[in-house]
Amino acid sequence: MKTLKFLSAEAFVQTGPNARRNLHCLSYNLYPILFKASYLHEEASFLHDLVQTWPLTELNLRKLLGKTTDCPEDLTCSTCRLCLEAFLTGLRDYVLQASTTYAKILQVVDLIGIRDTEHQICQCRRTLGRWARTEMLTRVCYETMVSMQAGQSAPSAFNVEVDVRLDAFVTGRNYEVVSQALLLRRHCPLKLQFVGLRVDSLSLRNLFYLLKLVESHGPQKLEVVHNVHLEAPHIEVMLSQLKFPRLRSLTFPAQALNVHRLGLEDQDLMRVLGELMSKLTELRELYLGFSTLTGHLRKLLSPLNTPLECIELANCSINALDMAYFANSLHSEHLVKLDLSGHEVADLFPNTFRKLLQRCSSTLISLGLEECGLDDEKLDLLTQALTPCHGLQELKILGNPLTSAALHRLFNTLANAYPALRYVELPVPRDCYPESVTYPLDDRTLVNYDSDKFQQARTELVGILEREGKGHVEVCTPLLGVYDADINETSNELGVSMLSSFNNVIGSFIDTVNTVTQRREHRLME
């Protein structure tokens, strides 16, 4: 329930021009509550003025918009474009304009706490996603420098220095403005600090240049994804030339590591990469989905001296030898999040799979086993392996050929144990598809199921949880993938880049065919 203090703040920010005129009369300790009230009601003009005259040393969106004693509503999942644009322009004017009420003591602005979600709670329904926030903030930094150089700022602007912490997203479309802002960072009052960085649709040359620019920021999270053609030799250069002492999370694009591409001279490359990663002493999360690591997992992970807590090995083609190492490794006793999707664990390494879950049972929170060939006969392996994992919160088993009867058994097990469980990705039961289908399902077959039968099965399964007091557990079936705000925001650019890459491949293939044809014709003429 909102306090009287917050209700008063709401009433004040909605008085329009009067609120802006009377802002200078307010005590500095009212600014945080007014910030949340104006954000909640999308009072953009007032929000701009509030930021422009901010009297405190910190402006942290997670703290300001999260649950508070005055207002329990969590606004961190609202990336309202209207409010965030007002916030960023207000930050620019904080630097450029002379102070009228309080001294300029702002030291840190933290934008990391807001989350991009599929359904916006703001009234305008227009979002400013991570990519757009990155572009706008870097433009604000650049515009601030231009205004100062043109003499369009107060003298106090040259004495301002504010660290601006951001979880950035850079693609080819915003690369130029981002790199320009980073180059001017030492001269700009707004000191950009990329705590996290996601990179997509970028050439290797631009990627390495960008990473060099942010190296001094000490990023904690680096995601190189999708349309960045990064391979093992490039990763070796990246890790050997750049220093990221605070890096905690590292993501590589699909097929960045592929042991089948390694020549005889590169057979030791995985060990070299492991040794380079061992220098990242804070590394706790490693995402390698859709790489090919067959027989090389030990080389890659054994040099690490600090245990990984999150690892994605989905569709990495690991074999029994890899799993034997992993189940007995330093990492196995510290895993919080594990994804082994795409591996038929019951056929390839049932005993070591059980051992792995036994060793990480005290820490494991999330387990991904999508398309692992788990059918009714192999369900016992899963339930036995999960038995010691009392802290499990998430279970993802899409794409497994389990019937409704088997899922009833599984949900009874989940309902009677696992007190922390909160999220289950439920596969469409095998008996909801035609009898002739084979697994893994192709995209066309995937959505061709008996929806009425599925809804009935789902209702029964959710009912099992509800009867045991677990109605709060989210049960979903995202057949086309879980919503990804970053992909959704940049899907057009990603599609164009992928089409361009496809055209280049086809063009090269056609050139090769034409060359071969010309050679054959030349031989025939001879």
Curated annotation (Swiss-Prot):
Gene3D superfamilies per record: Ribonuclease Inhibitor (3.80.10.10)
Domain of life of the source: Eukaryota
GO terms (BP aspect): negative regulation of apoptotic process; negative regulation of cell differentiation; negative regulation of DNA-templated transcription; positive regulation of cell population proliferation
Keyword vocabulary terms for this entry: Leucine-rich repeat, Repeat
Annotated LRR repeat ranges: 103-140, 191-215, 244-279, 280-304, 305-336, 337-355, 361-388, 389-413
InterPro entries linked to this entry: LRR_dom_sf, PRAME, PRAME_domain
Family: Belongs to the PRAME family. LRRC14 subfamily.
Protein name in UniProt: Leucine-rich repeat-containing protein 14B
Organism name: Danio rerio
